[in-house]
């Protein structure tokens, strides 16, 4: 018997240990090799070679889905209060003008040029137009003029003329001003702000193939004629419809009079030629009982009879106007409120307050009629996508459920707005969608089946030196993300990649990506937001930039002028040697020079400690009480790390699934 205490060697099935006296007590403990005949009785163990076991693990942990590529840019909005976005295609090319608005008082309207094919973002202008909550690009009817409609928080919509990027010395100008509050008297409503439930213009859109503008203000739907407003000193709406409980609308494609509306009453069709609208009390009771009140509605671009609507229970339902009920429901946000819905061909994207964007693949059966009997569509990955039978050790399918949703974790906070993108490409599978979130990130998400072209066999059990070199080559970074017209400064975006998961049996981890110690990030100034000379007098510039009205014998708000100064002072990355061709003939920076500058340039430098400083509730309905923020997250390693290197920093990440 030993003179010292020795713990008892416990016996457990499949974990038998043996002791060798000639070795130390630690090194002498080794596992006994189990006979192959005993493997049949160990069904509770995870077997990597068992398709049933790997199917459950891969499906629940999202390990077997396709690659999805995402690019991210940081928008220089100090208060992180982005409200809306709008995209305007430039002819048949893959370049588009992108407008992003904020609820701030100044420097809150950002104009970018986006190259959809190469994923480049070029900053053009920054404009001060206070408290923008909705906007829409005006359709170009055979001219090259760029105009933007914006709606603010005080019931005013502005028609703004945006200078082209190649026009130097030009200023942005407010062409017309549409006063919504003043015209409420015509429908016997009090125009005072105190009597309104909301003073924000929450939605702007144009009727299909026309210049008729629809705007939503305080449960009222306004219809304006943009073409006819030039001859009016004070534009008047064509019609005003009071619709209690209305939240959103969407014009029907290929129709000049019909609009789909949604709200507390559910979903409905509306004819602009009949401005009177009433909801029966029985319909309201049924909508509240079934939780069919809706906040977003979008018509299918390929079928004028089908539309999608997000409802109060966090479920998207597909409706056919030839039926009195929905024919499919899409549940993928776990009851969270859905903020935006976008169609792209027959694909549907939804973004919610959970920070996820769900891609719904409806290509196979959306065009069939009568519609397939699919009453429930769910996610094809994640814990909610599987039903496990422990007796049969197999995955069971839910009856009448079609799993067609793919989750993209796009944001750590919540999605604010989305915009669908169509590429001019021969590849019909090129599907992209833009998003902005409450952390002031702009995301470009691509449905690409070969997002990372790295020829690594997924069945390998180790990385070779060539594989590691190839992985590191795909993770080369660049300090510069915005590009200008100079051939010397065109660089690829900053990239942060996460490769497809492979099994590694060796203890040696792949080497970390070296970071140059000599690189010092700099923050160039944004456009020097200034105000220009008005038609009758100079505009005074104080600490807060505002538009000053010209003095006439009558009160006219249609001639206010302001300017922007575009600064493309973007430097090349010292750590990247790749270059591309220029976007234009000129190698000089694009700029618009103001007439009078009475204020110092506005710098958008920000302190890292203020990145997640939520000072107040957002005016567009995303308050601090809607989610909790952990300050310790600032020190963690995000897939989309915040950067102060440029005015709008680009991130590239691959969600391997």
UniProtKB/Swiss-Prot annotation:
Organism: Debaryomyces hansenii (strain ATCC 36239 / CBS 767 / BCRC 21394 / JCM 1990 / NBRC 0083 / IGC 2968)
PANTHER family: WD40 REPEAT FAMILY
Any Gene Ontology biological process: cell wall organization
Function text: Involved in cell wall metabolism and required for the separation of the mother and daughter cells.
Bias type Low complexity, positions: 572-592
PROSITE patterns (UniProt xref): WD_REPEATS_2, WD_REPEATS_REGION
Record protein name field: Protein DSE1
Gene3D superfamilies registered for this protein in UniProt: YVTN repeat-like/Quinoprotein amine dehydrogenase (2.130.10.10)
Region feature (Disordered): 565-602
Per-repeat ranges for WD: 77-122, 127-170, 196-234, 287-329, 332-370
Family: Belongs to the WD repeat DSE1 family.
Keywords: Cell cycle, Cell division, Cell wall biogenesis/degradation, Repeat, WD repeat
Origin organism lineage: Eukaryota, Fungi, Dikarya, Ascomycota, Saccharomycotina
